[in-house]
């Protein structure tokens, strides 16, 4: 529910990204709707084929020839979506019988090819991107408000959405949100120590290596690179960023992108 409220608030209601799936959408769906959608979307010029493994040339030719038989279309699959630019909003949807409350903090950020993307990923990982993150230590271990909390920067078309999300115990939503902002403030005012930075770099290096440690993982990673116009050189750039990242850079990024007044908050459940 919190995610739906976020999307409705970022995108215009009635657009594909801003319209949550409702029961009546499914009830009103017909075979004709599905056929029309299939004809509009499943077009030869919209298909990228990725294959990995011991594949012969004749197999590749057969696959390509098969999909080339589909028709072609220049009609956009998803129309251009307008973004709501208001920041720092508060949305509350009560659920009186809920035993937990969902908190969601979010803001719109840059696209995948932005120059700060790799360094911001390191900042995000430190804040809430792995089990030893600041948010896990604060909101879970120290405060005991939740079993799990995480942050992510999700890339969509020409922008991204940074968010922090967690299900917290009843009546502790406000305290949990304040704890999140306390950790963001620490990132903006205190440089990360050498030991914590070393642990963070080790974790990220391992995560990047796991993303290409077998043929299936490598293909998934390559598909993502291809989607955003990148290639195998991206892996080298990721490791170069890990090597050169400094406490000063992390502090600067936190101040540049995570100012409290720009972050919207959602609570679903009880305060």
Show which residues each predicted segment covers.
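Charge-rich, well-structured scaffold segments of protease-associated domains
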Residues: 1-76, 111, 119, 141-271
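His/Glu-based metal-binding/catalytic segments typifying zinc-dependent metallopeptidases
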Residues: 75-133
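Phosphate-proximal small/polar/acidic motifs at interfaces that engage nucleotide phosphates
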Residues: 136-137
